[in-house]
Amino acid sequence: MVMLDTLANAMAAIKNAEMRGKGEAIIMPSSKLIANVLRILEKEGYIGGFEYIDDGRWGKFRVKLLGRINDIGVVKPRTPVSYRELAKMPEHLRKYLASRDVGLLILSTPQGVMTHREALKRKIGGIVIAYVY
């Protein structure tokens, strides 16, 4: 089986486990990008935590779910945004959030993976890769 977008597969695994009411989700294969996104979700209180499991091949993440995620996914096509665009929150980005103050956009920036709120504080832009609310 060829996995073209491991981040999309990880977000789908989390969303499906949340919809089924499960307490944990297994994400495989692992990557640094997925680890950084999970770190953000943990810091913002959407997941209870995660751990890396070395299976001798690609590795896996076990994610503890709290039942706080209503929707999660990737943004396709990956959209580059400047700081000014992010401050205005254009329509093509607003559609991924429930409302202005609810949810997060996750960006890949030159300074690392971060939320849109953190990018606004640092006054930098990046590529929008995922959303959660």
Curated annotation (Swiss-Prot):
Record keywords, A-Z: Ribonucleoprotein, Ribosomal protein, RNA-binding, rRNA-binding
GO cellular component term, pick one:
ribonucleoprotein complex
What is known about its subunit structure? Part of the 30S ribosomal subunit.
SUPFAM superfamilies from the UniProt entry: Ribosomal protein S8
UniProt keyword RNA-binding, yes or no: yes
Q: What is the lineage of its organism?
A: Archaea, Thermoproteota, Thermoprotei, Desulfurococcales, Desulfurococcaceae
Which GO biological process annotations does it have? translation
| Descriptive protein name | Small ribosomal subunit protein uS8
Q: Report the function annotation for this chain.
A: One of the primary rRNA binding proteins, it binds directly to 16S rRNA central domain where it helps coordinate assembly of the platform of the 30S subunit.
List, in alphabetical order, the Gene Ontology terms for molecular function in this entry: rRNA binding; structural constituent of ribosome
Reply yes or no: does the keyword Ribosomal protein apply: yes
Matching entries from Gene3D superfamilies are given as: 3.30.1370.30, 3.30.1490.10
- Please name the PROSITE patterns in this protein's record: RIBOSOMAL_S8
Give the family from UniProt.
Answer: Belongs to the universal ribosomal protein uS8 family.
